[in-house]
Curated annotation (Swiss-Prot):
Does not seem to be able to bind GTP. Pfam families: ABA_GPCR, GPHR_N. Ubiquitous. It catalyses: iodide(out) = iodide(in); chloride(in) = chloride(out); bromide(in) = bromide(out); fluoride(in) = fluoride(out). GO terms for biological process: intracellular pH reduction; positive regulation of canonical NF-kappaB signal transduction; protein transport; T cell differentiation. The keyword Nucleotide-binding does not apply. This is Golgi pH regulator A. It comes from Homo sapiens. PANTHER family: G-PROTEIN COUPLED RECEPTOR 89-RELATED, GOLGI PH REGULATOR A-RELATED. GO terms for cellular component: Golgi cisterna membrane; Golgi membrane; Golgi-associated vesicle membrane; monoatomic ion channel complex. Homotrimer. Interacts with RABL3; the interaction stabilizes GPR89A. Keywords: Glycoprotein, Golgi apparatus, Ion channel, Ion transport, Membrane, Protein transport, Transmembrane, Transmembrane helix, Transport, Voltage-gated channel. The lineage of its organism: Eukaryota, Metazoa, Chordata, Craniata, Vertebrata. Its main location: Golgi. It is a multi-pass membrane protein.
Amino acid sequence: MSFLIDSSIMITSQILFFGFGWLFFMRQLFKDYEIRQYVVQVIFSVTFAFSCTMFELIIFEILGVLNSSSRYFHWKMNLCVILLILVFMVPFYIGYFIVSNIRLLHKQRLLFSCLLWLTFMYFFWKLGDPFPILSPKHGILSIEQLISRVGVIGVTLMALLSGFGAVNCPYTYMSYFLRNVTDTDILALERRLLQTMDMIISKKKRMAMARRTMFQKGEVHNKPSGFWGMIKSVTTSASGSENLTLIQQEVDALEELSRQLFLETADLYATKERIEYSKTFKGKYFNFLGYFFSIYCVWKIFMATINIVFDRVGKTDPVTRGIEITVNYLGIQFDVKFWSQHISFILVGIIIVTSIRGLLITLTKFFYAISSSKSSNVIVLLLAQIMGMYFVSSVLLIRMSMPLEYRTIITEVLGELQFNFYHRWFDVIFLVSALSSILFLYLAHKQAPEKQMAP
């Protein structure tokens, strides 16, 4: 009876997650596009539902909600379904929609879709060869084979996003990095933009006048008399077309310049708004957060370097370790086990909420940046693939943030994976991503004033 009640709770929560994923799909991703394939919407919503269910089961594990055997069953079932979606269903449909957009392959799209899926499976399987991700006990058809490979891709994505976010967040929030933009700078750039637009209009007028003159001459000398008249008309039209071609090239160059000037003007306006915003109370609060995140970024890079150099992986969760150090230093009586459980629950909850929110914001921006009416179905499926792999690998990494007694069932469900490898791999990719982001933002920040000062 308790299993039925537990299952009804899980099914209800999955329906709610599915509905939220459906609404997000309709209201955010596809609000400007026509939905042609409902299977894409269903796959995205199902992936989102089962991804969120894994985080829900982590919270249930800490709070002790549901029976232990029920949690284990739903962990196992949830993991099997999400792997089925990520390894078999989504890659096949991505190949199917890619082939469907190619007219030459339209009649045999099912065959070519299967070939693309088999190609994906080959490279997906070969991905595990260079990495020590599995125990030798596992067979070739075990579920751990799939989890381990999905985990490598997902952890790589997480580390790349985390490394960039750890650097970009303080750069975005701190007023220290803002350029000093005045109204004079904006007016000067706007004047250049207007001058460029005037030049484009005048040259287009010249082109229109030249075409009109050529058309009128063509009507007057419509039927040239004799051989020399024909030669004259041909040479006149050739020289006129050459002039038009040269003017058109000048117009194209000026239009490209006007686009760049417009983007620079918009950037100056955005920077000026950020300067005004930084003077408000909320702006000062985010500026303080920027300093806090910059300290966190330096600490995270330092710890990642230490972990890589000394091949170190923590045995206890960070909360318990931090409380133990504080209690021993102050020499006070404190129930470390009791409070570490509650603080770990809050920490894991914050990690889960920020992970879901941050990923959804990133997916929305990414979708609008590269999507079109033809490619939107393929891109949504790619986003579903990234989202699923991201959440599966989040479970692998969040496991280390939980006290030891709560890790048992997750370890049993995920199998005997080499968990230490994933943490070391995360540190390596995080460090590379963070240092690359620092270099990129430094060069971008250095070039911005030079652009502004350019005549």
